[in-house]
Each structure stands twice: as structure tokens, then as C-alpha cells.
Design a protein with these regions (language model features):
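Conserved P-loop NTPase motor module
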Residues: 1-2, 9-21, 135, 141-179
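Conserved P-loop NTPase motor cores
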Residues: 3-141
Length: 179
């Protein structure tokens, strides 16, 4: 598919997601603010973007900027975003301009929770740039040595926690090795 067509379809998909978030979230917000609904009964909206680097990168700034707007506003409507990718370097390819890097950096700065799993050691400079002052030097140097299921949870404005995610055999069977 041509890049222009993909970008147009992506714009439309993200726009429709945003409209749906408002359509669901605005009535929930009004109902919550008028004390007519319990917290646990609020309908929430979540967009999960797997292989996020295909959409969010320095070569697709329109999508990144659209998601920035979503990140800034969605919480008001009980909406959220999850991005998943294997390597931070895919978001910021070599040779990216500082302006485009700043857009990606802001996108991650606005992200409340960041689960950082093992990355290759050649990604450390990019991790340091994108997560500036969010990870200590010790945490950064430990990232390439994280084992299977181990991660660092970086919580915006609070702290970082290193832990291991254990997956049951039943859960593994559901995904059949990630398929």
C-alpha cells in the first residue's frame, strides 16, 4: 500500500477512535460529575496499538501529533492508550531530526506508565534520549540484561519498579507462543 494511502487511512482510523472516545466518554463524564454513577461502573475507552513503531515514528509525525492530542485529552473522557513495540529505536530511526525526536519524546513523556523490557545495548542512547531523567544510569545499564518476563515499570512522577511478569501455562496456551 502506498504511504499516502496508509497515512490517510490511519488519520481516519485515529479520528474515528477519538470520536468514539468522546461519544462514550462525554456522557460518562457528565454522569460521574453529577454523582449518578459509581467509579467501577464507568465505561472506559482504550486503544491498544501493537507494533506501534509502524504508526508512531519520526517519519509519521502527523500520526504522532494526532496521538499527542489524544493523550492530552482522553483521560478527561476515561480514555487511554497503550503502545507496544520491541525496540525504542524503531520509533526514532537513525538520522531523525531533533524536532521530530522531540515529538516522540513528548509522546512518551505524557505516557503515565512505561513497561520497558529487554532492549539491545545499542538502544541505550535512544532510551536515554527519549526517557531523559526518567531512568537512572543503573536502570538504563540493566535493561539489556533483563531476562524473560522482567521489566522496569516507569511511573510518571513517582518511581520506577523492576519486576518479573509470570505467565501461566493456560495463558501461554491462549497465545500459542505469540501467534
Amino acid at each position: 500500500m502506498k504511504s499516502e494511502i496508509f497515512d490517510a487511512q490511519l488519520f481516519n482510523a485515529l479520528f474515528l477512535c477519538w470520536q468514539n472516545c468522546i461519544h462514550v466518554g462525554l456522557p460518562m463524564k457528565k454522569t460521574w460529575e453529577s454523582n449518578q454513577i459509581d467509579w467501577q461502573d464507568i465505561t472506559r475507552f482504550l486503544i491498544f496499538i501493537d507494533e506501534a513503531h509502524k504508526i508512531i515514528n519520526t517519519n509519521k509525525l502527523e500520526a504522532a501529533e494526532q496521538l499527542l492530542k489524544f493523550e492530552r485529552e482522553a483521560r478527561k473522557y476515561f480514555g487511554g492508550l497503550i503502545y507496544a513495540s520491541q525496540s525504542i529505536r524503531d520509533f526514532v530511526p537513525e538520522g531523525s531530526s531533533q524536532d521530530s525526536i522531540n515529538v516522540i519524546k513528548t509522546l512518551f513523556e505524557l505516557t503515565q506508565y512505561k513497561f520497558i523490557m529487554r532492549q539491545d545495548s545499542n538502544a541505550l542512547d535512544t532510551l536515554s534520549t527519549i526517557f531523559h531523567n526518567q531512568l537512572t544510569e543503573t536502570e538504563l545499564s540493566h535493561i539489556p540484561r533483563l531476562g524473560k518476563g522482567e521489566c522496569i515499570l516507569s511511573i510518571k512522577g513517582d518511581e520506577n519498579i523492576e519486576f518479573k511478569v509470570d505467565v501461566s501455562e493456560a495463558d501461554l496456551a491462549i497465545f500459542q507462543g505469540g501467534a
